[in-house]
């Protein structure tokens, strides 16, 4: 990342002798379409996730133990059967989501993610909006001031996200228990959706730049650490598609929650294959 403008010499694009161009950009293509699509995608997820987190209903289907990821782990005293494994330590107040201890960390993990940072820097703060498009502001401070300096905490939120992914995996495993299945085992479309969501959450988390640094960072000689080197190469392969996984997981989270909401509300029955 380039240095703040206050530390740059008056040369290059900052040279006083550089030609002054009145137009913000000379690009003739629809460069604004990509930022617009990203803004709409972010807005759709934020609105949906916020509405569902505060709806406080249709988040758990006890017959098949389906629990939406937006309410996991469910720690409120109003969670009922959804928190059999977890202590109900949160008060039942309307302004506090049932998963209030995990949602902030997941939000901060995504907000500080390298891809998401680059995305909303362009679309929300327009810094820059697009290649060869001038920024609307004159001064650039980078990630040296509050609140952007908080971006450096991403490496710590990575560990919390890993713990929450373990919890989501537990939820997906428990959902294979059915009250009607042979030996208590059941398998339906909801299980498929939950497992796919968990797999994609793991792929997104493990493809994180912080994970790449954890596995291979600070190694001066890879040949002396063949296991870590192999893990680093695999994480690096995943890392090349981190942007794709970031968007896929937003979709799988919404799909999983929406499907469980429909089943829990009685709008549709779960398509069962076994039990």
Predicted feature locations:
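Membrane-embedded alpha-helical bundles that constitute the cytochrome b-like, heme-associated redox core
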Residues: 1-275
């Amino acid at each position: 990342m380039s240095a703040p403008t206050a530390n740059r010499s008056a040369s290059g694009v900052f040279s006083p002798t550089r030609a002054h161009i009145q137009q913000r950009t000379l690009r003739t293509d629809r460069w604004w379409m990509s930022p617009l699509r990203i803004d709409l995608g972010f807005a759709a997820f934020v609105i949906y996730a916020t509405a569902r987190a505060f709806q406080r209903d249709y988040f758990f289907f006890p017959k098949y133990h389906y629990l939406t990821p937006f309410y996991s782990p469910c720690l409120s005293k109003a969670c009922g059967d959804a928190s059999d494994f977890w202590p109900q330590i949160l008060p039942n107040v309307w302004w506090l989501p049932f998963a209030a201890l995990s949602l902030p960390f997941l939000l901060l993990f995504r907000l500080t993610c390298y891809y998401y940072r680059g995305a909303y820097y362009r679309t929300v703060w327009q810094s820059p909006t697009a290649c060869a498009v001038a920024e609307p502001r004159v001064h650039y401070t980078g990630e040296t001031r509050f609140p952007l300096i908080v971006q450096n905490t991403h490496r710590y939120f990575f560990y919390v996200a890993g713990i929450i992914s373990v919890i989501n995996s537990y939820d997906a495993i428990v959902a294979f228990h059915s009250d009607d299945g042979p030996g208590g085992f059941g398998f339906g479309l909801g299980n498929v959706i939950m497992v796919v969501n968990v797999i994609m959450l793991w792929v997104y988390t493990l493809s994180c730049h912080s994970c790449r640094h954890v596995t291979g960072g600070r190694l001066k000689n890879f040949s002396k650490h063949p296991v870590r080197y192999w893990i680093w190469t695999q994480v690096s392969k995943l890392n090349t598609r981190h942007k794709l996984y970031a968007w896929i997981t937003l979709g799988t989270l919404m799909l999983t929650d929406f499907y469980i909401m429909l089943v829990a509300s009685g709008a549709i029955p779960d398509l069962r294959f076994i039990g």
